């Protein structure tokens, strides 16, 4: 229920004003990634008039959480029902929603270069989507959001690529400070986080949302609309 409310809020926030929708959802499609050397699965939401119009649409990249996949927002979060309702109530514009699978990559480039997921996302996935579907390619028509691991990924991408997104909605984002990360690398997620971030702290610093924000000149913060939702017990 909490995830459904989150999604309704971000759809209304990211692209407000608009039309009616009786949409189509395709689950577990895929494209070949040269950077990863494997297929990348994704699910996609197409608005009601996609097949009868020639217009291009704004896009929301919606990222899943840890242990989830490209189908979870649809099967567990009722994404289609919520998006249809928001559009029908004119609280969101007709849009395309892309939900890629990220496995347990945390949406970053692995420190040793073996799994450059972030590079794949921006250099292959986004261009593929814009070539395959009628998606607007300007910043003001592209938003990103995610839950937990996906909240971290959406937050990180908005900071690493501020020229790419007009809005970002990290939901219960799994954002850690140095102390928590060191503890996780030593104990609870030892194999995973050491594989992703490496034995030192340099790669972690480059992908630490809190450090990036603290190092940023306040006058140069990205011009992105943020909707940040975090509960008292998140963390």
Please identify what each model-predicted range represents:
Residues 17-21:
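Sec/Tat signal peptide C-region and signal peptidase I cleavage site
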Residues 22-235:
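Non-catalytic cap/lid and distal C-terminal segments of serine-dependent acyl enzymes
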């Amino acid at each position: 229920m909490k995830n459904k409310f989150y999604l309704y809020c971000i759809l209304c926030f990211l692209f407000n004003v608009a039309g009616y929708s009786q949409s189509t959802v395709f689950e577990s499609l895929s494209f070949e990634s040269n950077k990863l050397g494997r297929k990348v699965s994704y699910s996609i939401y197409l608005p009601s008039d996609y097949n009868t119009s020639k217009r291009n649409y704004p896009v929301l990249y919606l990222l899943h959480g840890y242990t989830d996949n490209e189908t979870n927002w649809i099967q567990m979060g009722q994404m289609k029902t919520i998006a249809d309702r928001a559009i029908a109530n004119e609280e969101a514009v007709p849009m395309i929603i892309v939900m890629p699978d990220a496995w347990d990559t945390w949406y970053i480039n692995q420190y040793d270069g073996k799994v450059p997921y972030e590079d794949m996302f921006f250099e292959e996935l986004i261009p593929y989507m814009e070539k395959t579907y009628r998606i607007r390619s300007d910043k003001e028509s592209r938003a990103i959001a995610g839950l937990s691991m996906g909240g971290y990924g959406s937050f990180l991408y908005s900071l690493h690529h501020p020229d790419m997104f007009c809005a970002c909605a990290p939901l219960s984002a799994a954002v850690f400070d140095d102390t928590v990360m060191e503890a996780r690398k030593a104990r609870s997620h030892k194999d995973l986080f050491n594989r992703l971030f490496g034995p030192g702290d340099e790669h972690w610093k480059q992908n630490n949302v809190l450090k990036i924000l603290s190092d940023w000149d306040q006058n140069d913060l990205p011009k992105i609309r943020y909707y940040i939702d975090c509960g008292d017990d998140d963390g």
